[in-house]
Curated annotation (Swiss-Prot):
One BP annotation, GO: xylan catabolic process
Documented EC number(s): 3.2.1.8
Pfam families, A to Z: CBM_1, Glyco_hydro_11
Annotated catalytic residues: 115, 206
Protein name as annotated: Ethylene-inducing xylanase 3
Length: 287
């Protein structure tokens, strides 16, 4: 005799077993930090995730943040400034990627719409792979290789759009140092890679269908987007030479002890006090 209650219990157990992976995936998504932007403790921050990874982003004191991720998906976040500029940035911390990930100064411009990266470290995949080489630049004792690529109908600060990506990838990986953004802006511009009006600029950790963790502390500031040259002022009309005041003592006559004559002398030839007496061919004096 078949026990239907036993079959029901067994079927329920099987259903739970098959449902568990789906439930865990949904739970991971629910536990991820939602995308957001804003300011925290004096720094701008940006955090974006497509929801496909179990990812946690945390703003810490000052310019510090931490991030950990797993289970796939795309995510990027960090702290910095808004707007970006040609500032000198220093950063330090720990970065532990497992798979496709990179640590970079990351930012955007508008008009033209450009996403840019100065890559300081990366995981198993060089993010510039497949991009067009545009030269190289040396900065802070290391070689950075320049690349450009086009992103078609991809997420951007203006929604889904087509835009350019600019890359500068450091040959020798590091997690900590100084990045002078003016060096890279100038190098890209010299290679014909035009930037627009700056939006945000952060020292970011990005992950793509990988796992890992990072804790990064950002500092710096100052600097600015170079201003256009000012309009030169018109030349100033030279002032006339100052007029020598007349000799003191009254009228146009020389004062006592003053010169009153001599070969080539064009000044006063009379004396307001005393008499003009020749001392030699070249000099006469009021005595």
């Amino acid at each position: 005799m078949v026990c239907f209650s036993s079959l029901f219990v067994a079927a329920s157990a099987i259903a739970v077993v098959f449902a568990s992976p789906v439930d865990h995936e949904q739970l991971a998504k629910r536990q991820s930090t939602p995308s957001s932007q804003g300011t925290h403790d004096g720094y701008f921050y940006s955090w974006w995730t497509d929801g496909g990874a179990a990812a946690t982003y945390t703003n810490l004191a000052g310019g510090e943040y931490s991030v950990s991720w797993s289970n796939g998906g795309n995510l990027v976040g960090g702290k910095g400034w808004n707007p970006g500029s040609a500032r000198t940035i220093t950063y330090s911390g720990t970065y532990n990627p497992n798979g496709n990930s990179y640590l970079a100064v990351y930012g955007w411009t508008r008009n033209p719409l450009v996403e840019y990266y100065v890559v300081e470290n990366f995981g198993t995949y060089n993010p510039s792979s497949g991009a067009t080489a545009r030269g190289q630049v040396t900065h802070d004792g290391a070689l950075y290789r320049l690349f450009e690529s086009t992103r078609t109908n991809q997420p951007s600060i203006d929604g889904t759009a087509t835009f350019q990506q600019y890359w500068a990838v450091r040959d020798v990986k590091r997690t900590g140092g100084t990045v002078n953004m003016a060096t890279f802006f100038n190098a890209w511009t010299s290679a014909g890679m035009r930037l627009g009006t700056h939006n945000y600029q952060v020292v970011a950790t990005e992950g793509y269908f990988s796992s890992g963790s990072a804790r990064i502390n950002v500092a710096g500031g100052g600097g600015s987007t170079p201003s256009p040259p000012s309009t030169p002022s018109p030349p100033t009309t030279p002032s006339p030479p100052p007029v020598t005041p007349p000799p003191s003592g009254g009228g146009s006559c020389a004062a006592r002890w003053g010169q009153c004559g001599g070969s080539g002398w064009n000044g006063a030839t009379c004396c307001s006090a005393g008499t003009c007496q020749a001392q030699n061919q070249w000099y006469s004096q009021c005595l």
